[in-house]
Amino acid sequence: MTIEATALAYKVADISLAEWGRKEIDIAEKEMPGLMAIRKKYAGQKPLKGARVAGSLHMTIQTAVLIETLVDLGADVRWASCNIFSTQDHAAAAIAATGVPVFAWKGETLEDYWWCTRQILDFGDGQGPNLIVDDGGDATLMIILGYKIENNPSMLQNAGGNAEERALFGQLKAIYEEDSNRWHKVAKEMKGVSEETTTGVHRLYQMMEKGELLFPAINVNDSVTKSKFDNLYGCRESLADGIKRATDVMIAGKVAVVLGYGDVGKGCAHSMRSYGARVIVTEIDPICALQAAMEGFEVTTMDKAVKEGNIFVTTTGNKDVVTLEHMKQMPDEAIVCNIGHFDNEIQVEPLNEYKGATKLNIKPQVDKYTFEDGHCIYLLAEGRLVNLGCATGHPSFVMSNSFTNQTLAQIELWKNDYKVDVYRLPKALDEEVARLHLEQIGVKLTTLSKEQAEYIGVPVTGPYKPEHYRY
């Protein structure tokens, strides 16, 4: 791949880790049949030829397989992680060694993070991306916020907020001083973004409602083969992996409090119960609360659960669901972690500023806070994604579902001219993604007869369910 002289080649922790990363990528490919089938299907066609793709998504081994799929399909790709702790350094090195510009390492500062995001949006010679693969919406946010600043530079004078906002505005200010029309030019060339996660999708819909969205978006998260698999089954395995790698704690016999019972919360609650924990769920939604109760979980408020829990897991995508006051009341040695996209589900900044607690780093991504009354808690991954900060995220097979959707979305956006809106992939593609993964796990599908298909009013080859079906 040719790298523009004006664009940085890569920045990773240690390029010498590339060989190790390549060995793990080879293993992951065998567990990612969807992506490998896409490569085979489009071999020689190069449906993404000419596309400049900026990726802001956890730089893991599984993501490496996605990146190489996009490259195989003809795309010019630049990549950064969407979380300061989620990069697997050997994966980043392996991809950088192939010539794909990667800007990611585990343990970035917030300033590093937004610098890396800036790099993936610069393809050299004044060019930005045509397409974005986003996870959490930060790459999209940088373009849209930069665009707004160019329309109203006074926004730079009012930049404050938390540390993350200050880091973002620092980059945007530097870009504005270099080129006061940069983001207008980038937005003009954009064909669209495909968004991976619930939080990012919420951002897209909010931008659309406010009239701020500048280019089309495909909501990959709400594809059934993403949300009902990655969010549910992926979290069911990777949550426990993160907690155990971080703490070596015995989960059996503990009380686990899972805040939120959406798809992610469901996976987490079932994970903790499968290890022998007694699980308490908190919810705002009466439907989700009823589901949790019907599964046998106790459902109550955080104010009541806070004094019982030994392990607290936030899954809501909302802010301030675990407050400083909650942490003051938790039992001694409680473990606090988050598996939602951002760190604001837990009040980490107020905790760090609180004079009545002493912080002690135990090891990377494990911090002990001792309060003035003598009790302590353990905060994992500084309140960021525990499964990626303290472990390696979801297994390859379930990520193949998600990333096959991402690849199809990128092709869809590149090949077609969508109006500015938020879209979902059609049901037929959702079913095709599932179909591509069946042989790997020995599944044999029953085939409808023509008469049976006519009787229930569906095509013999699908799709079999209406768009509103909830699986």
Curated annotation (Swiss-Prot):
The keyword Hydrolase applies. It is found in: Cytoplasm. Binds 1 NAD(+) per subunit. It is an enzyme of class 3 (hydrolase). NAD(+) binds at residues 197-199, 231, 260-265, 283, 318, 339-341, 387. Substrate binds at residues 60, 135, 196, 226, 230. GO terms for molecular function: adenosylhomocysteinase activity. Its cofactor is NAD(+). It comes from the Bacteria. It catalyses: S-adenosyl-L-homocysteine + H2O = L-homocysteine + adenosine. It holds the Pfam family AdoHcyase. One of its GO terms (cellular component) is cytosol. Its EC number is 3.13.2.1. Keywords: Cytoplasm, Hydrolase, NAD, One-carbon metabolism. One of its GO terms (biological process) is one-carbon metabolic process. InterPro entries: Adenosylhomocyst_ase-like_sf, Adenosylhomocysteinase-like, Ado_hCys_hydrolase_NAD-bd, NAD(P)-bd_dom_sf, S-Ado-L-homoCys_hydrolase_CS. Coiled coil: none annotated. May play a key role in the regulation of the intracellular concentration of adenosylhomocysteine. This is Adenosylhomocysteinase. It comes from Chlorobium luteolum (strain DSM 273 / BCRC 81028 / 2530) (Pelodictyon luteolum).
